Amino acid sequence: MQRLAIILAMCGATTLALWPVENTSPSYIWNASESVPIGLYRLRDVGRLDVTELVAVRPPEPLATFLALNGYLPNGLPMLKRVLALPGQTVCRTGPTIVVDSIEMGQARDRDQRGRPLPVWQGCRILGADEIFVMNWQSADSFDGRYFGPIPASSVIGRAIPVWTDRE
């Protein structure tokens, strides 16, 4: 346990030391959520996004406030999510089922791990030029597009490249 505390302290100190003061987006972030491997990630320029890419997203309002008020993510912190759909693709939620371009991609849950009801959106939409859909399909407990739907592409602050994770 002491070894883990030392590693976490070193990662935190490294992150602060490498964080450019003039930049509002971090160069490195620590992910503590289990929806992707826990660990240190370096952020790279976005450029053109691809489906399945792991990105850091700054939640837009009112999502950011919802996440903070309900204890999912402190205000101002980015979340790591996989890009599941890009502009021009069709994303649907019918009941709990998430479908992208007629392919079932996963299920939403009714309640979170604490038993609280989760947000629900329904219907189909073709993503606009400025929208993406993010979902960590490998994690059934991830709070992602299953619950909040598409988000602005401008919410992406960088590609997340693993530096060190608990799965290495």
Per-region residue spans from a language model:
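Acidic/glycine-rich C-terminal interaction modules and beta/coil loop segments
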Residues: A108-Q113, P117-A160, W164
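Surface loops and adjacent helix of pleckstrin homology
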Residues: V46, P60, P96, I103, ...
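Residues that act as N-cap/strand-start positions at coil-to-secondary-structure junctions
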Residues: S35, L77-M79, A85, L118-W121
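Mid-length scaffold segments of soluble, non-membrane domains
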Residues: N75-Q107
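Protein maturation boundaries and topogenic segments
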Residues: M1-P78, I126, F148-E168
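Residue-level marker of beta-strand positions
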Residues: L40, L54, T90, E131-I132
